[in-house]
């Protein structure tokens, strides 16, 4: 399929600098399929439930790269490029790696929330920024309270990498209260 090949070249081939060389990374099948399924849901879903979901990939399958490829493809789509993207991770190393990978792929400013106050400010802004935050910032916000209705926009996507705690319980309620749509 020529269209699939072109899509693979345009949206699923990234170059990352490593030790002074550029390394080409091309999506594996599960990454290609996951990104396109998410894009389909975002473009065709009419409710929050229809637009949301979980992508489950095994350890070492390239989940972070899948998220970066999704962001790259969204930024190239006229309907989805205005979305704010919020990356939630559970490890400092993963947070830094994700920011660097996206910066290398897209050459776009990434805003890292270093505190709860900074996170509130970044989430409140009505913009198409890319924000990264450690899951601990949401936990701290949950403990502090006053983290509701920060941004009512329906043009916000939260992508959690290895942050299972964001899916259920109090932490999920905190994120949903802050970003209700």
Annotate each PLM feature.
Residues 109-114, 165:
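Acidic/polar loop patches that form or flank catalytic/metal-binding clefts of enzymes
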Residues 92, 113-121, 135-140:
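Conserved helicase motor
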């Amino acid at each position: 399929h020529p269209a699939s090949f072109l899509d693979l070249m345009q949206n699923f081939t990234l170059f990352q600098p490593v030790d002074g060389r550029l390394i080409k990374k091309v999506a594996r099948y599960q990454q290609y399929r996951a990104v396109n399924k998410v894009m389909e849901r975002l473009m065709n879903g009419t409710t929050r439930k229809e637009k949301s979901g979980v992508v489950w990939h095994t350890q070492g399958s390239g989940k972070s790269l899948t998220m970066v490829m999704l962001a790259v493809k969204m930024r190239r789509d006229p309907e989805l490029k205005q979305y704010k993207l919020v990356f939630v991770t559970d490890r400092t190393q993963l947070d830094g790696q994700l920011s660097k990978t996206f910066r290398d792929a897209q050459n776009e400013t990434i805003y890292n929330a270093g505190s709860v106050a900074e996170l509130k400010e970044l989430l409140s802004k009505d913009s198409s920024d890319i924000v990264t935050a450690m899951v601990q910032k949401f936990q701290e916000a949950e403990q502090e309270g006053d983290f509701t209705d920060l941004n009512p926009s329906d043009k916000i996507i939260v992508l959690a990498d290895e942050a299972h705690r964001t899916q259920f319980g109090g932490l999920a309620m905190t994120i949903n209260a802050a970003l209700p749509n």
